[in-house]
């Protein structure tokens, strides 16, 4: 297997099976595999070190924060998501945190971006970025592909950090940025595999196998793309008539995913993501999400649905 442990060729065969190789050297697509594979650069999974590398005030729990509000989260999290992350607005809330594996850092205000970079020997070869429309801490309504102007602004922000700390790295690098600061780094793709760009995915395979970057943007390169999430109340397991749902929406989207209930633990405490929907048109992902919400069992609490872009209550 080339792609490990998540295989986009098998997950999205309608997009990639005929164009993207599925053999050759290992290409990490999940954090636990990347941690083992990229031993020299895996320090970036230490979120405390990433914060310190930018000169931020931060420290291990239970050291006292220098300001509030702060975000408290695990120093390491190879599961993904917002597991065990929380916001503390004052010392009373912070004092209730008893977790030796966590650290605190400032709560950043501003736009939240997920940036996918392709690096060759530490040099940025390509970049795609997405802006998240927040619902509440750790949860998002939808993500949208940024335009070139926004990409240029983000590149100016992150490029000095990449040049200083990613020297010699070849592969995918996902950075999460809020405002002017990098909050997380992952040695893998973020969401670019969902774009449906087979030439891009083939180029990533070629980069890992032949150590050269061949991708050139063209008229097929997506300029608009949306990923809509569906969240629901915690402490419940949700299910759906998958065959019926796929019959209704399967051919209308680039990709969708009904999340595995066994992975709900990676979500923030106030809610679990139960599905995502991906397409070049926002109306399409909103339509599919509304249908999914109506078909989910048990019913999703209305407080998770009413704030969503384009939400309409359906009876199915």
PLM regions with names:
Residues 22-24, 55, 209-214:
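Short loop/turn hinge sites at secondary-structure boundaries
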Residues 113-119, 175-177, 265:
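Broad, structure-driven detector of short, well-ordered beta-strand segments within folded domains
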Residues 29-161, 316:
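Active-site nucleotide/adenylate-binding loops and adjacent lid/helix of ATP-dependent enzymes
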Residues 167-180, 276-277:
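A short glycine-rich, hydrophobically flanked beta-strand micro-motif that places a catalytic Asp/Glu
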Residues 107-111, 166-171:
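A short catalytic or substrate-binding loop motif that flags glycine-/basic-rich loops and adjacent residues
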Residues 1-52, 282-316:
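ATP-binding N-terminal substructure of ATP-dependent carboxylate-amine bond-forming enzymes
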Residues 206-316:
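Peripheral (often C-terminal) accessory segments that flank ATP-dependent C-N-forming ligase machineries
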Residues 117-167, 179-227:
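ATP-dependent carboxylate/phosphate-activation module, predominantly the ATP-grasp catalytic core
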């Amino acid at each position: 297997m080339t792609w490990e442990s998540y295989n986009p060729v098998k997950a999205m065969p309608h997009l990639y099976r005929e164009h993207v190789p599925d053999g050759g050297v290992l290409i990490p697509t999940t954090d636990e595999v990347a941690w083992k594979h990229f031993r020299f650069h895996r320090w970036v999974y230490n979120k405390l070190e990433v914060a310190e590398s930018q000169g931020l005030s931060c420290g291990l729990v239970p050291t006292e924060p220098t300001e509030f509000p702060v975000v408290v989260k695990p120093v390491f999290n190879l599961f993904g998501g917002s597991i065990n992350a929380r916001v503390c607005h004052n010392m009373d809330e912070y004092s209730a945190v008893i977790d030796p594996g966590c650290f605190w850092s400032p709560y950043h205000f501003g736009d939240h971006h997920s940036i996918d970079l392709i690096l060759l020997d530490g040099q940025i070869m390509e970049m795609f970025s997405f802006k998240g429309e927040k619902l509440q801490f750790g949860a998002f309504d939808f993500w949208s592909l940024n335009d070139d102007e926004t990409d240029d602004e983000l590149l100016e922000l992150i490029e000095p950090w990449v040049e200083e700390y990613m020297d010699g790295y070849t592969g995918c690098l996902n950075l999460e940025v809020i405002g002017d600061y990098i909050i997380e780094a992952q040695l893998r793709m973020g969401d670019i595999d969902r774009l449906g760009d087979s030439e891009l995915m083939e180029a990533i395979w070629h980069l890992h196998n032949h150590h050269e970057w061949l991708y050139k943007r063209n008229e097929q390169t997506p300029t608009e793309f949306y990923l809509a999430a569906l969240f629901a109340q915690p402490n419940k397991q949700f299910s759906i008539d998958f065959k019926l749902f796929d019959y209704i929406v399967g051919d209308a989207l680039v990709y969708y995913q009904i999340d595995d209930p066994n992975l709900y633990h990676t979500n923030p405490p106030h809610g679990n993501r139960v599905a995502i929907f991906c397409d070049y048109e926002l109306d399409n992902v909103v339509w599919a999400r509304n249908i999914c919400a109506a078909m989910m069992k048990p019913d999703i609490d209305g407080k998770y649905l009413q704030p969503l872009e384009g939400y309409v209550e359906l009876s199915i």
